[in-house]
Amino acid sequence: MEVEMEFAGRLKKIRIKLIMIGICLIFLGGYSLIQEWKDQKKNTTKKVFDQYTDAFFKENISTNEITMHFFLENPEKYRLEQPKNLYPSMNQGSILNEKIKISKEIEKLKKFKQKELTKKQQNTYMVLMDYLRRQKNLSMYPYYERILGKTSGQQAQILLTLSEYRLKNEKDIKSYFQLLKGLDGYFDSLIEYSKEQVKRNLFLSDQSLKEVLQQIQNVIKQKENNMLVATFNLRIADIKGINAAQKKKYCRENKKLIGTKVLPAYEKLYSHLQALNGNGKNENGLYYYKNGKEYYKVLVAQKTGSDKTIEEMIEISDRSIEKCLRKLIKLQKKYPNIINEYRNHKKI
């Protein structure tokens, strides 16, 4: 009897152990399934994030012809089609759409859990989020941007951009000609933007406008010695696969388009801007516009990518300049003729 009871007790213990082992196996199996599901989810998140950044790049690089051509030599490798727009648009509709788009992109990005991304993806996430947030802050001041200027204005910079437009084949030449033909439309958006600035008391000072008008006038006067003629002739000379006769034909067409499309576009821009003379309410800097101080802070943060205050940046700049001056003084003491030798391009 005692033996039977002892045997039964052992069986009971064995059953309990087996049940515990079974529970552990179920738990471990469930845990591994959960872990596998989590790993799959992480891999899916990584894949979706790569798809998102790829789409973001393609969409932003192909907004207009001049931007895409500047950044990509072979856009077909990215399966990008020819952009519908030739130039960036500065009209009211596009400005509003850009503001909405930035907010949507931020919300899309927020949906990704950073801990499920690789370190490289996390860095991309942080850089992109920082960029979008700074752009969003800047979009709150849509008509504060100085789009016109003697040298840095878009009416001046577009000449440099066109003169450096990459020409590798006939397709590039034809795209370039389309840009010349579409310059008038681009300037129309600058005119519209400037008129909106007038309404908001954000237009250029009369002195700044005078300098812009002088720059435009100088372009108009250069009918024969226009930089777009000289630079085009140099660039097309290096293109292989086009015979001499065809190159001459393209050079003549370029010169004709400058006379019939480019210069008239500048003349129209000059006329419209001249009519806005006297509307500049601020002869000082951005700070002196309504909300100018706030805009300046946002602009500096966007341009530098830093969250330091203006005062902190000035202090850092001053220290850096002072450090450079001390080094220069030491060098001049050691090499008394260093400045003259530098000016004469002699080896020190």
Can you annotate each of these PLM segments?
Residues I23-F27:
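Hydrophobic core
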